[in-house]
Swiss-Prot record:
RED subdomain: region residues: 107-155
Entry-linked InterPro entries: Homeodomain-like_sf, PAIRED_DNA-bd_dom, Paired_dom, PAX_fam, WH-like_DNA-bd_sf
Listed result of changing G97E: In n578; almost normal male tail. Abnormal egg-laying by hermaphrodites, as a result of defects in the vulva and the uterus, and their subsequent connection during the larval L4 stage. Abnormal morphology in vulval cell vulF
UniProt lineage: Eukaryota, Metazoa, Ecdysozoa, Nematoda, Chromadorea
UniProt region (Disordered), positions on chain: 166-198
Protein name according to UniProt: Paired box protein 5 homolog
Pfam families: PAX
DNA-binding region (UniProt annotation): 29-155
Keyword vocabulary terms for this entry: Chromosome, Developmental protein, DNA-binding, Nucleus, Paired box, Transcription, Transcription regulation
Gene Ontology biological-process annotations: apoptotic process; cell fate specification; embryo development ending in birth or egg hatching; nematode larval development; nematode male tail tip morphogenesis; positive regulation of transcription by RNA polymerase II; regulation of transcription by RNA polymerase II; uterus development
Compositionally biased spans, kind Low complexity: 166-179, 189-198
Annotated function: Transcription factor. Binds to specific DNA sequence motifs in regulatory elements, for example in the genes encoding transcription factor lin-48, apoptosis regulator ced-9 and neuropeptide-like protein nlp-2. Specifies cell fate, playing an essential role in embryonic and larval development. Involved in morphogenesis of the vulva and uterus in hermaphrodites and of the rectal epithelium of the tail in males. Plays multiple roles in the development of the egg-laying system, acting in both lin-3/EGF-pathway-dependent and -independent processes.
Length: 289
């Protein structure tokens, strides 16, 4: 069964006797006929002549639906071509099998940076128009508004704007760095000084702690001025002699200070009597010793 469009009365069908050779159809790509009778090739853009004709008819006031019927191009294709022309000013299609050619060249980016530096409040569409007026870019390769906004937001672009201020700050930075090196000693000397200081502090802390321990371990012995009494003697904390120890049977003033006590006879556990010293008696004391 033959296709229903086999005898389609348009010379654009390849089987028609009035069909003219089209180089776009010679590579074996899949071709088809749209609802209006026009031939299209999948994956291939519309011819530049047809694109220019669509734009020309639109500028003369023809509606997109009428352009679609007259040129036998789908309405979606016409709308896409016109939208691309109004946004970029170009009717050329994108590169087949790759990305679009780069329009944001270093020269264009530098010019955008100059415009933005001279007038920070300039809008993207004003920058785009300025590029065209200064003949830096043409209608076909001028960056779009979104591309200009992306360039302005880029970090490298902001660094390029801040380049004049960074040069002045870097010129003042070496003088401060040299003065810092002149004031501060080398790192090795600083480390040696810190180590010696820490060792000295540790030694001083050890000496202080040793003196504190000695003062706590040694009981205070305060001698009364002009007398031979001591605190231990006044408090009566002398060791008690025992009957089993022979060396305490014969009391000797050389072995112990017996100036505060006297014996009542035999030396026993309860035979030691405390003598009240004169130095601690009150002034109105009149008793007998």
């Amino acid at each position: 069964m033959e296709p229903i469009w086999r005898n389609y009365p348009y010379p654009t069908y390849p089987g028609h006797h009035n069909f003219q050779f089209d180089p776009l159809l010679s590579d074996g790509s899949h071709t088809g006929v749209n609802q209006l009778g026009g031939v299209f090739v999948n994956g291939r853009p519309l011819a530049d002549t047809v694109r220019a004709q669509i734009v020309e008819m639109s500028q003369h006031g023809t509606r997109p639906c009428d352009i679609s019927r007259q040129l036998k191009v789908s309405h979606g294709c016409v709308s896409k071509i016109l939208g691309r022309y109004y946004s970029t000013g170009s009717v050329r299609p994108g590169v087949i099998g790759g990305s679009k050619p780069k329009v944001a060249t270093p020269r264009v980016v530098e010019c955008i940076a100059g415009y933005k530096r001279a007038n920070p409040t300039m809008f993207a569409w004003e920058i785009r128009q300025k590029l065209i007026e200064d003949q830096i870019c043409g209608e076909e390769n001028v960056p779009s508004v979104s591309s200009i906004n992306r360039i302005v937001r880029n970090k490298s672009f902001m660094a390029q704007l801040a380049a004049p201020t960074s040069v002045t700050s870097s010129a003042a930075r070496p003088s401060s760095a040299t003065s810092h090196h002149q004031r501060s000693p080398p790192r090795g000397v600083q480390q040696h000084m810190q180590q010696s200081t820490s060792v000295q502090q540790l030694q001083q802390l050890q000496l202080t702690s040793a003196a504190t321990v000695n003062s706590l371990m040694t009981p205070p012995a305060f001698a009364m001025p002009g007398t031979a009494y001591s605190i231990n003697g006044l408090l009566g904390t002398l060791p008690q002699p025992s009957l089993l120890d022979d060396k305490f049977t014969n009391l000797s003033t050389q072995s112990a200070d017996m100036s505060l006590v006297y014996s009542t006879g035999l030396v026993g556990e309860h035979d030691w009597t405390m003598r009240t010293p004169m130095v601690i008696l009150p002034q109105n004391y009149c008793g007998q010793l």
